[in-house]
Amino acid sequence: MVRVRFAPSPTGPLHIGGARSALFNYLFARKNNGVFIVRIEDTDLERSSRESEKNILESLKWLGITWDEGIEVGGENGPYRQTERLDLYQKYAQKLIEEGFAYYCFCTEEELEEERKNLLAKGEMPRYLGKCRNLTPEQKEKYLAEGRKPTVRFKVPAGRTIVINDLVRGVVSFETDGIGDFIIVKSDGIPTYNFAVVIDDVTMGITHVLRGEEHLSNTPRQILIYEALGFKIPEFAHISLILGKDRTKMSKRHGATSVENYREKGYLPEALVNFLALLGWSPGTEEEIFTMEQLIERFSLDRVAKNPAIFDLDKLNWINGYYIRNSELSRIVELSLPFFQSCGYVSQNPTEEEMRKLTKVVEATREYVVTLSELPEHAAIFYQKELAFEEEAKTLLADEEARNILRKVADKLREIPGSEEEEIKGFLKKLPKELGVGGKKVYMPLRAALTGKTHGPELYQVIAILGPAEAERRIMNLFN
């Protein structure tokens, strides 16, 4: 059975790259009727926090990425936080030492820095040269007496080529001579990433490791640990980096970098999932809109690209706009409510009347926005008593003929029997004939008078939302 995992470090919010890794693992597990595990790699004690952990888990849930085993949901392979598994790492580190695959290293940071500088001066790759590999018991005692706290290093075999058959990148090989003996347990007893990740993956039965390309260089070290402990090596798939449009590493200047930022800006979870799936994966067709169910059905690693994925904010905006326009109206109203509340257009405990109006407002304006946060700006014409007039609208309303027509329209507005859209549509349709002028001469100044703009929602929607009385008031304001 396929078993995959997402293992974030809780040192900050869930970033776009992490969200994509989680999504690809989730899709792969669901496609193959497998198990998706979420565990927390919190061995960076200084930077890890429960607050960040909470943010990451909430962001995953918001995206609709659920897990079968792991943090919060439990399972038979727990605990699922690395800081709660230290005894396990210690046990396997001791096994490696006893079997001659690892050793205690007493080198100080100063000594290691000196060694690094010397290698660089010779034009060689910095690596540990094995000074403590073959210490005598007396030398170890001497270092301990000096108060030195040892690390544990893995003994890297010389002259080997490690070959990885990566499911995305194909055959990749590494020479062990360029690696050097690496630390697996720090002097404070905390395991390093490369060691802990192997122990976790093995004890949790992980069959496939899908992760970012930046982890590729760690893979030979991890394979050496698998081999030394006699563990089965999982399949690896390293997903390409996400770059900005300028082909540099994704950063804040390319747009928001965390899932939380996009949520706050009014992006829909299904739009972000759709967009993230297309960052490095291709369906093999021209289609661009996919539900989670469709992604699960279509996803495969052989359609994941080796080349870097380009983060195109315009494309995300297009996808998000599509979902805003085409999702159930009631859902968009519910999701947009906080944005209307934060600017004071809707109260914190909305009345039925407020919600009825909001529903009409969202229906009238949603086709003009790409994020929910833009809705209040487009809806301001329905909530603000004083309109801000665009220059084009001012010019239109300065025309004497237009002003005369508007006076007549104001009188006619009193004749509308109610404020239902169909009634208003009928009223608007017969208005030009009743006034004896072309439709354009009625509708353009009327729109300008009611909204301060020359473009926007359908006129019948504008009057239905404002109500005939408010529409009349706005027209008469022009003459006061």
From Swiss-Prot:
Signal peptide: none annotated. It is an enzyme of class 6 (ligase). GO terms for cellular component: cytosol. Its main location: cytoplasm. A motif ('HIGH' region) lies at residues 8-18. One of its GO terms (molecular function) is glutamate-tRNA ligase activity. GO terms for biological process: glutamyl-tRNA aminoacylation. Belongs to the class-I aminoacyl-tRNA synthetase family. Glutamate--tRNA ligase type 1 subfamily. This is Glutamate--tRNA ligase.
